[in-house]
A protein has these predicted regions:
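Short, gly/Ser/Thr-rich active-site loops of penicillin-recognizing serine hydrolases
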Residues: 569-572, 671-728
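Acidic/histidine-enriched alpha-helical segments
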Residues: 110-124, 349-367, 504-507, 557-567, ...
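Amphipathic, well-packed alpha-helical segments that form the structural scaffold of globular domains
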Residues: 286, 290-293, 303-304, 334-342, ...
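Membrane-proximal periplasmic segments of bacterial cell-envelope enzymes
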Residues: 1-314, 350, 354-360, 705, ...
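Beta-lactamase-like hydrolase cores
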Residues: 331-364, 379
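Beta-lactam-recognizing serine transpeptidase/beta-lactamase-like catalytic domain environment
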Residues: 72, 78, 299-316, 325, ...
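Solvent-exposed, polar/charged alpha-helical surfaces in well-ordered, non-transmembrane soluble domains
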Residues: 93-101, 209, 213, 238-242, ...
Length: 728
């Protein structure tokens, strides 16, 4: 190669190198621009995915009895859920039609809270809200408000609005109503890309299988596993357990008197379609039972493809609430109460127009105030509440009424031990004090209340007065003690005041000098448990426990502990809490106990019982009357308080049987309860047993003349009441 050719090659190589250098420089600069200057923007364009977070509901904690048996639990169920995110561009109304047809074919229902029925023959609609239902009327008003309609809007106006808003004009009237109702429900549940719509709940396994089989042609229609509240024994303390239910519109959106709107449940982490405790222990312990929801994250690309799912927060189940009640003992007390009511009707009320048809029993531990049983008769089954609510609510026996905690009853002679404690402790009387009983109380001119004097007459001391329920003794001692004093003692023992139970209870009241109808005669009537005084069965049991504990009253309670659901570890345990104390300055409670032991010696079912029981009967009047010949008489309730063993009590109880008659008629019931208690202690009582066993004197003949006559002292009959009573 000559020199000229060599120069040409060198020049060409230099040019190529220069060109390559320029290209490399441009490429490097472009990389710098892409990666450093605008990297975030181009990365987003390259990936272009969106994350959507969905709530995974945590399992609700169980409620168990003192032995660990489940009473309320969360069981697996299946919901039909629509995901707007996964539905994509599908025709929503066509999809809804298909789902409805599938659900109808399997006998399922779907969520539809629109208070409008099907159109009539003329194509007009009517509201289904009940005129006398406050909740229905509130829901109707909220519906109109949410649709932007005036409150005078008709059902036709509402449907016209829904048809217009959701473009349903092309559908037949029936489908306009169906689809309009579903769209309204979607609106209520805030259906969106981040909030799924629960269309149907607790569907059958057949429905689940059918929807899964059609999943490829029904995008966004999913079966979601969830939990439903169920009750292993639906008739165990349903009134106390309470219920769970959907969050209502009123609770979700709260508007105060100034028009300020807040969403308190949303602020606590709830979704609008969540379940929540609405009454009883389910509501009181909502924060413990609820658990912590999880979060599932779904990632979708720009072209709508789901590219990833992850459980970003694992749900945590709620805590377990353990009760003080043993299910087997509770069942035994329930059956014993029903058996006693049946006995009263067959033996005493068979020809009466008023039957004993309702009652309540509360049994507590005297050691700490824990409730061992709280029975209502009649009652209901939690598992049937939703399907049989109409039947329950219209039942004249009022099975939905929590008589044990909210029933208010005149205590009758069960109140007399409280007056005795007040008189003894305040020094009005002592163990040697007597009142002369000749059958008529003559202190007031023109007012002569009577005493039947069965088993006693002459000078009566406090022990004898309690045993034979002497009205004259308590008229006089009550008058001298005054209602101000004996009421104060009664309050301390748990009467006319809250006992401390975790769920709603009635307060009751005692007769006071501030009552509008107060007279001196009312004061002495209050001393025998009549007048304006009304108490609850749980108060009677608490009061009996205070008598047994020589004046120490514990807070009455249903919850034993809060447990970790996964480990069973005790997180919180209820400790005995003293609510009040009467300082026993001598033999006050010993004397009252002796009198109450004397009562049990006269009562069928208790007089031969192997354990000494202290009790007091009561036969308070009801307002309804009947005639025996020309004599007008009042129907009466059966009342009883008891504790035992008398010298070192373990349990105390309060009993009410409406229209039961004499208080001593509950004697066999008390014996049955103690039988069940001792069977529970020795482990021989099981949940499947029929309850109480045989006790002494269980036949009708065992209810002899003695207790029947004693009962007559517990009520003031009309023939002893004056036309006018003396003023205070």
């Amino acid at each position: 190669m000559n020199q000229d050719e060599h120069k040409i090659v060198v020049r060409r190589m230099a040019g190529l190198i220069a060109a390559a250098s320029v290209l490399i420089a441009v490429y490097v600069l472009r990389l710098i621009f892409l990666q450093l200057v605008n990297s975030d923007s181009f990365k987003a364009q390259a990936t272009n995915t969106t994350d959507y977070n969905f709530t995974v509901t945590a399992a609700r904690g169980d409620i168990v009895d003192s032995a660990g048996r489940r009473i309320a639990a969360s069981t697996t169920s299946y919901n039909v859920v629509l995901s707007k995110l996964l539905m994509g561009d599908e025709d929503l109304d066509a999809m809804l039609q298909r789902i409805v047809e599938l659900l109808e074919a399997h006998g399922e229902k779907w969520n539809d809270s629109l208070l409008i029925g099907e159109p009539d023959a003329a194509g007009h609609y009517s509201f289904t809200a009940q005129a006398d239902s406050t909740s229905d009327q509130k829901a109707l008003a909220a519906m109109k408000d949410s649709l932007g309609l005036q409150q005078y809007a008709t059902a036709d106006d509402v449907m016209e609005k829904l048809v217009e808003d959701y473009k349903l004009e092309s559908y037949p009237l029936h489908w306009q109503r169906v689809l309009g109702g579903i769209h309204y429900e979607m609106q209520q549940q805030a259906f969106s890309n981040v909030n799924n719509f629960v269309m149907a709940e607790n569907v059958s396994e057949v429905t689940v299988a059918t929807i899964k089989e059609n999943s490829l042609t029904m995008p966004g229609v999913e079966i979601v596993e969830t939990s439903t509240r169920s009750y292993d024994e639906g008739d165990i303390i349903p009134h106390v357990l309470g219920r769970v239910g959907k969050i209502t519109a009123e609770k979700w959106k709260v508007t105060d008197e100034n028009g300020q709107t807040t969403y308190p449940l949303r602020e606590k982490g709830y979704n609008m379609n969540d379940m929540i405790g609405v009454s009883g222990l389910e509501a009181v312990y909502e924060d413990e039972l609820r658990g912590r929801d999880g979060v599932e994250t779904i990632t979708r690309s720009s072209d709508g493809v789901i590219v990833g799912t992850a459980m970003t927060t694992v749900p945590e189940p709620g805590h377990t609430v353990q009760l003080t009640i043993d299910s087997a003992f509770q069942q035994a007390v329930d059956k014993a109460l029903a058996k006693n009511i049946e006995m009263i009707n067959s033996t005493y009320n068979s020809s009466s127009s008023a039957k004993a048809a309702a009652g309540a029993v509360v049994v507590i531990s005297t050691k700490d105030g824990s409730v061992l049983a709280a029975s209502n008769y009649p009652s209901y089954d939690q598992n049937l509440f939703a399907t049989q609510y109409s039947q329950y609510s219209s039942d004249p026996g009022l099975p939905l009424l929590n008589r044990a905690l909210q029933g208010l009853y005149t205590p009758g002679s069960t109140f007399k031990p409280a007056v005795a404690v007040a008189a003894l402790d305040s020094g009005v009387i002592n163990r040697f004090s007597t009142v002369y009983c000749n059958g008529v109380y003559t202190y007031y001119d023109g007012y002569r209340p009577k005493c039947t004097r069965h088993g006693h007459s002459g000078n009566i001391d406090v022990i004898t007065a309690i045993k034979w329920s002497c009205n004259i003794f308590f008229y006089d001692v009550g008058r001298r003690t005054t209602s101000d004093v004996y009421d104060a003692y009664a309050y301390k023992m748990g009467l006319g005041t809250r006992t401390g139970v975790e769920v709603n209870e009635a307060t009751g009241r005692l007769t006071t000098k501030n009552d509008s109808n107060y007279t001196a005669s009312l004061d002495i009537q209050a001393a025998i448990g009549q007048g304006n005084t009304v108490v609850t069965p749980v108060q009677l049991a608490t009061y009996a426990g205070t008598l047994a504990n020589r004046g120490v009253r514990y807070r009455t309670h249903f919850v034993k502990a809060i447990l970790d659901t996964n480990t069973g570890k005790v997180l919180q345990e209820t400790q005995p809490e003293v609510m009040d104390v009467i300082e026993d300055r001598g033999d006050t409670f010993d004397l009252v106990r002796q009198g109450m032991i004397g009562v049990s010696e006269t009562v069928s079912g208790l007089k031969n019982y192997p354990v000494t029981i202290a009790c007091k009967t009561g036969t308070p009047q009801r307002s309804e009357t009947y005639y025996v010949g020309s004599t007008r008489k009042h129907y009466t309730n059966t009342m009883m308080i008891a504790y035992g063993p008398a010298e070192d009590a373990e349990i105390a109880l309060g009993i009410v049987i409406e229209y039961g008659g004499g208080g001593a008629r509950a004697g066999n019931l008390v014996a049955d309860i103690f039988d069940a208690y001792y069977a529970m202690k020795d482990g021989s009582l099981t949940l499947d047993e029929t309850g109480a066993g045989e006790t002494a004197d269980t036949t009708a003949d065992g209810e002899d003349a003695v207790p029947e006559t004693v009962e007559n002292n517990d009520a003031l009959t009309d023939d002893t009441a004056p036309a006018e009573q003396p003023a205070a």
